[in-house]
Regions:
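NTP-binding/hydrolysis catalytic cores, primarily Walker-type P-loop NTPases
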Residues: 198-251
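Nucleotide-state-sensitive switch-loop elements of NTP-binding domains
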Residues: 2-7, 30, 34-94
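Rossmann-fold NAD(P)-dependent oxidoreductase module
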Residues: 27
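Short amphipathic alpha-helical segment that frequently serves as the phosphate-/nucleotide-binding helix
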Residues: 18-23, 133-137
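Charge-biased, low-complexity intrinsically disordered regions
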Residues: 24, 178, 228-229
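Glycine-rich phosphate-binding P-loop
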Residues: 8-22
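Amphipathic coiled-coil/heptad-repeat helices and related helical stalk/stem segments
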Residues: 21, 67-71, 132
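Conserved catalytic-core segment of NTP-binding enzymes
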Residues: 95-199
Length: 251
């Protein structure tokens, strides 16, 4: 997984992108990688607020408008570093980012430079279900158009229930099955159906704490820490499945 870049992209806001980005960063740190993190969200820079992850806040707005030119430094860094790079992008950044990537053939540029790009996106149930699914479709279309080696990791956020499409679970949909060469895997973030788990994770996210900080904090009791560890360890286990071969090869 060295020399890889990870963009978290979804056009629908409030679906858990920053949580996914922070969990992903912690996963790679736990697995022993050097990680560089960045946040491009001009509206709600939640990822940037995780101080322990040393996230860089990238300026992409000029005169109150997102400027594609300001994406240049980000992708130049992705092309030049050997670190595992994780970039969280806000909902308002989704369309400008996709246009920049397509206009500048960035998927091919990264591939030609020997980099492996993973795009992470979030799928949910509830009112945002169709919007998040459409976002996944757009990402796959972009990758197909450029015929690159870019892979997609789908985070299935089950907070609003398990998403079902025309009676089928996500992994049985035509979009997933028909694009198995692009889909690296699905990482479920399960709903524990417990107000205790929900409250604990909410407290962690509102304080912008990492799992390691929670373990050392006196603000969480032993049982709460156990619940929080279970949530993150389950996600790490799912990511091991998603990236299994690559992680093993690095070891």
């Amino acid at each position: 997984m060295k020399n890889t870049s990870h963009l978290v992209l979804q056009g629908k806001g409030g679906v858990g992108k920053s949580f996914s980005a922070s969990a992903l960063a912690q996963y790679f740190i736990e697995r022993g990688y050097n990680v560089a993190c960045a946040d491009t969200d001009p509206v709600n820079s939640s990822f940037y607020q995780f101080a322990a992850l040393n996230v860089s806040l990238l300026k992409i707005m000029e005169g109150g408008v997102i400027s594609q030119k300001l994406f240049d430094p980000l992708f130049e860094e992705l092309l030049s570093t050997d670190d595992v790079c994780i970039v969280d992008n806000g909902a308002s950044t989704f369309i400008p980012m996709l246009k920049f990537i397509s206009d500048n053939c960035m998927l091919s540029a990264l591939q030609d430079a020997g980099k492996q790009l993973y795009i992470h996106t979030v799928i949910t149930a509830g009112q945002a279900k169709d919007d998040t699914f459409n976002g996944l479709e757009r990402l796959i279309e972009m990758i197909r158009a450029e015929q690159s080696n870019t892979k997609v990791v789908v985070w299935q956020n089950e907070f609003w229930g398990v998403p079902v499409f025309d009676g089928k679970p996500l992994d049985k949909t035509e979009l997933i099955l028909g694009n198995s060469d692009i889909i690296q895997g699905i990482c479920p973030v399960i709903d524990r159906n417990s107000d205790a788990f929900t409250a604990d994770i909410r407290n962690v996210l509102e304080a912008h704490l990492t799992l390691q900080e929670v373990k050392q904090s006196e603000d969480f009791g032993v049982i709460a820490k156990s619940r929080i560890c279970r949530v993150y360890n389950d996600i790490f286990t799912e990511l091991d499945k998603v990236f299994g071969r690559e992680v093993i090869d690095d070891e």
